[in-house]
């Protein structure tokens, strides 16, 4: 029992560590200046949500092109959950994303977001495991995180992510659900981002249970 309790505390600690590293604004400007053709200036926000939103730790996540901040590339809500020897990060879609655009930068907009505004993206949770000073994550097994294409075809998402205290690195790739052929995604390697603002002080000061 003592071992079990200790393991539970360790799992919670890992989840809180991942959350504190995630919390922030990230920018690709360093890599844009090196090669703007393959690295447009992108900013990503992981803004902590109040404890009452999930009864634990959650984030509003928004990715924008720097030149067009009011038309995000994506908007999601994420929930951080200890899971065995890993950390599960559930993904939720916004029912009306336009209502919450800018919430990564504006706390008044963030305050308009409620659990009624979101719905779970089934099969799209990310599973993170710590490897030294890095958390390495990927989409949960099963190829069930489906992304429809404009031509009516369906793809599944494979996402590769690395998180440190100061960086976010990611590559998303879409594969045909029938042939498993690569349909979309970067051909020039993962996108790299540096943390330029730290929001970890906004994470609720209550342990995940």
UniProtKB/Swiss-Prot annotation:
Q: Does the keyword Lyase apply?
A: yes
Question: Could you say which residues form the signal peptide?
Answer: none
Any idea of its EC number? 4.-.-.-
Entry coiled-coil feature ranges:
none
**GO molecular function annotations of the record:** lyase activity
Question: Which top-level enzyme class is recorded in the Swiss-Prot or TrEMBL entry?
Answer: lyase
* Alphabetic keyword roster: Lyase
Lyase recorded as keyword = yes
Question: What job does this protein perform?
Answer: Covalently attaches a chromophore to Cys residue(s) of phycobiliproteins.
User: Do you know which PANTHER family this protein is assigned to?
Assistant: CHROMOPHORE LYASE CRL, CHLOROPLASTIC
Q: Which family does it belong to?
A: Belongs to the CpcT/CpeT biliprotein lyase family.
Q: What is this protein called?
A: Chromophore lyase CpcT/CpeT 1
The organism that produces this protein has a lineage beginning with:
Bacteria, Bacillati, Cyanobacteriota, Cyanophyceae, Oscillatoriophycideae
Q: What gene is this protein a product of?
A: cpcT1
């Amino acid at each position: 029992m003592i071992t079990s309790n200790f393991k539970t505390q360790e799992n919670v600690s890992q989840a809180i560590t991942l959350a504190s590293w995630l919390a922030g604004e990230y920018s690709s400007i360093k890599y844009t200046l090196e090669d703007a053709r393959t690295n447009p200036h992108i900013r990503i926000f992981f803004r902590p949500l109040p404890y009452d939103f999930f009864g634990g730790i959650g984030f509003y996540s928004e990715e924008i092109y720097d030149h067009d901040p009011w038309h995000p590339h994506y908007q999601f809500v994420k929930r951080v959950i200890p899971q065995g020897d890993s950390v599960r990060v559930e993904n939720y879609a916004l029912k009306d994303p336009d209502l919450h655009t800018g919430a990564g930068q504006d706390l008044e907009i963030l305050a308009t977001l409620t659990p009624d505004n979101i719905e779970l993206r089934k099969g799209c949770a990310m599973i993170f495991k710590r490897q030294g000073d890095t958390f390495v994550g990927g989409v949960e097994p099963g190829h069930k995180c489906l992304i429809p294409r404009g031509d009516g075809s369906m793809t599944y998402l494979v996402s590769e992510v690395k998180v440190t205290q100061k960086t976010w690195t990611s590559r998303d790739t879409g594969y045909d659900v029938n042939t498993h052929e690569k349909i979309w995604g970067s051909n020039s390697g993962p996108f790299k981002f540096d943390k330029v603002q730290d929001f970890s002080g906004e994470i609720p000061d209550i342990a995940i249970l």
